[in-house]
Amino acid sequence: MRVVGADISKMSVVDMKTGVCSSELKPSVDEPTHRVLYQAFPEILSVVHTHSKYATSFAQANLEIKNYGTTHSDFTKYSIPCTEVISKELLTESYEKNTGKLIIKTLKELGISPFEIPGILVANHGVFSWGKDLKTAVKNAESIEYIANLAFNTLLIKPKISIIPKHIS
């Protein structure tokens, strides 16, 4: 996954308090998810959403990405969590906004800050990552995809593997 030719002039500008778009470009349909995250975690200054192959495969399986090795530990000592499946009521009420609330709920239930785990899998959906700027948020999305690829291959080789021992991570 790479961001090629990112052009800030091709990005929509949205007021995070009101949700009003002040540019000519239409914001992403996931904008309400981004806005909820920015409001809940003011230290987050950029959010990236992907449907990368391996991480999204874990999301579609409703599985966290467990920490099997030091490469994962270099990114975070925690598993990359997966939210619970969104309810039918929340889906029909305001899917994108409630997706953001589900991300917040998951992090709070785990007792982990968004910078201890700078990304999450949304069940049956995809990946959201964040950071102090766009470059960091993209790098976090790339790291989650790489870790998911390693975890996938590790599970193929040894399906009943245990997570990395704490003294190594």
Explain the meaning of each model-derived region.
Residues 1-169:
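Glycine-rich flexible loops
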